[in-house]
């Protein structure tokens, strides 16, 4: 349903944000 699509999209966004944050931290070190 629509709700599961929204949840999946939210998970994908969180994953991408986490990867970006991890990359930024790695670059800063």
Curated annotation (Swiss-Prot):
Source organism of the structure: Phyllomedusa trinitatis
Main subcellular location of this protein, as a coarse class: secreted
An annotated GO BP: defense response
Positions in coiled-coil regions: none
Keyword terms of this UniProt record: Amphibian defense peptide, Antimicrobial, Secreted
Taxonomic lineage from the root: Eukaryota, Metazoa, Chordata, Craniata, Vertebrata
Family: Belongs to the frog skin active peptide (FSAP) family. Dermaseptin subfamily.
Stated name of the protein: Dermaseptin-9TR
InterPro entries attached to this UniProt entry: Dermaseptin_dom
Function: Has antimicrobial activity.
């Amino acid at each position: 349903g629509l709700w599961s699509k929204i949840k999946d999209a939210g998970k994908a966004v969180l994953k991408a944000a986490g990867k970006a944050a991890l990359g930024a931290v790695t670059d800063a070190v």
